[in-house]
Curated annotation (Swiss-Prot):
Residues bearing the modification Leucine amide: L12
Tissue-specificity statement: Expressed by the skin glands.
One CC-aspect GO term: extracellular region
Keywords: Amidation, Amphibian defense peptide, Antibiotic, Antimicrobial, Immunity, Innate immunity, Secreted
Origin superkingdom: Eukaryota
Localization: Secreted
Keyword Secreted (UniProt): yes
Principal cellular location given in the protein's record: secreted
Role noted for this protein: Antimicrobial peptide with selective activity. Is only active against Micrococcus luteus (MIC=25 ug/ml) and not against Bacillus cereus, Escherichia coli, Leuconostoc mesenteroides, Micrococcus luteus, Pastewella haemolytica, Staphylococcus aureus, Streptococcus faecalis and Streptococcus uberis.
Protein name (record): Frenatin-1
BP GO annotations: defense response to bacterium; innate immune response
Length: 12
């Protein structure tokens, strides 16, 4: 989802 994309970029 959205968090998956953000987390993927931030490395979280």
């Amino acid at each position: 989802g959205l968090l998956d994309a953000l987390s993927g970029i931030l490395g979280l």
